[in-house]
Amino acid sequence: MLKTLKDKKLENCSSINNKSKKQKHIVVGLSGGVDSSLSAALLMEDGWKVEGLTLWLMKGEGSCCSEGLVDAAGLCEDLGIQHNILDSRVIFEREVIKKTTEGYESGYTPLPCSMCNKNVKFEEMLKFVIKQKEFTYIATGHYARVIKSSCEHINNSENFQFKDFLLLRGADRNKDQSYFLYSLSQEVLSRLILPLGDLKKEETRKEALRLGLRTAKKPESQDLCLVEHYGSMQKFIDNHVKTKNGEIKHINGKTLGTHNGIQHFTIGQRKGLGIAWPEPLYVESLDKQKNIVYVANKNDLLKREAIIKEVNWVSIEAPIKEIEVEAQIRYRSEPVKGILVPLKSKDNLTKRFKLIFEDNQSSVTPGQAAVFYKGEILLGGGLISEFSKK
Ligand SMILES: Nc1ncnc2c1ncn2[C@@H]1O[C@H](COP(=O)(O)OP(=O)(O)OP(=O)(O)O)[C@@H](O)[C@H]1O
């Protein structure tokens, strides 16, 4: 197995070294792309007993569909391993397509990859391995890391109550996919091996070439399989969400134009508004009830707080008092400092938190995930449900 960890101390903590591996059974989620192919090949090289599993997510061409299934099958043939295919089209339709559509209808900007990881990919893989006769691990080609919290090199100056397994950012910050994994449970983490967590994307390609994998030169897939499938998110929306004309208003109340459905807009959007105004205007909020798109100057987009719902604590027990975090509010955005305050609920098991930013933030977008980190450790995350003004 390649050793590329920058921090050699953490290397000894990595789950791949902690979980005794020789001849242990592992099921690798294969999408037909280079990342999951290399994951399977590296695990084999490392002595694991590997099987492939491809979830059939949608009808059609492309990596999520028939092309992905065929590529994954070919890879398994090359590697001489069993290939399993699960028809997950119904659950994908219900949990991703329908919920993404409902999100847009409600004026949110949904995050289909998180929905898929939460309710389809890892659910289905876990169910599959639990049914196996012997204890079976799970692997995917995500760029993130899982380590044991008992690792002595973990800094816990905040006195967090760590759970047994911690989820960490991928070592390659440009490829880090931990943001999409905030909904994982300890049950999944205890079985999960992420063989690419310590690699850079260039290293993945090099390794795939070294091992002669048929997917070594396959182009990078889109971040979003729905984009790859439909051509663009706009086309997905046109296909699924009904058009309902409404008004575009300045937050000062002045009507500036009309729109053909709030689903076509996202917070922070500047282009394509089709309105004339002396200074640049941006989408500030979407009012589903009144079917209004509100626009404002850049400064008016700045928010002080957001309410985060359905929070899942991945690596720590749910905090009962406020904690300081680094919050990432979009996949590609830099983490920002903030304070998380638990909001009371009747059962005392709050899943709602108020996130107060140290500096006001633009692009706080309901429907996107807010993921909380402390350095490399992903503490937990949830969905931005609303924001309050500056
Ligand atoms: N249809 C699927 N069936 C099983 N596992 C999947 C499927 N799609 C994705 N995965 C797993 O999830 C990981 C991350 O998926 P993502 O869609 O982000 O692909 P990716 O980063 O482009 O990886 P790849 O190069 O393997 O396609 C994949 O590496 C793979 O292990």
From Swiss-Prot:
Keywords: ATP-binding, Cytoplasm, Disulfide bond, Nucleotide-binding, RNA-binding, Transferase, tRNA processing, tRNA-binding. The active site is at C116, C225. One of its GO terms (cellular component) is cytoplasm. It catalyses: S-sulfanyl-L-cysteinyl-[protein] + uridine(34) in tRNA + AH2 + ATP = 2-thiouridine(34) in tRNA + L-cysteinyl-[protein] + A + AMP + diphosphate + H(+). Signal peptide: none annotated. Its EC number is 2.8.1.13. GO terms for molecular function: ATP binding; tRNA binding; tRNA-uridine 2-sulfurtransferase activity. ATP binds at G29, L30, S31, G32, G33, V34, D35, S36, L55, G141. The record marks H142, Q368 as: Interaction with tRNA. Disulfide bonds join C116-C225. Its main location: cytoplasm. Residues 175-177, 330-331 are annotated as: Interaction with tRNA. It is an enzyme of class 2 (transferase). InterPro entries: MnmA-like, MnmA-like_C, MnmA-like_central, MnmA-like_central_sf, Rossmann-like_a/b/a_fold. GO terms for biological process: tRNA wobble position uridine thiolation. It is found in: Cytoplasm. Belongs to the MnmA/TRMU family. Catalyzes the 2-thiolation of uridine at the wobble position (U34) of tRNA, leading to the formation of s(2)U34. This is tRNA-specific 2-thiouridylase MnmA. It comes from Prochlorococcus marinus (strain MIT 9515).
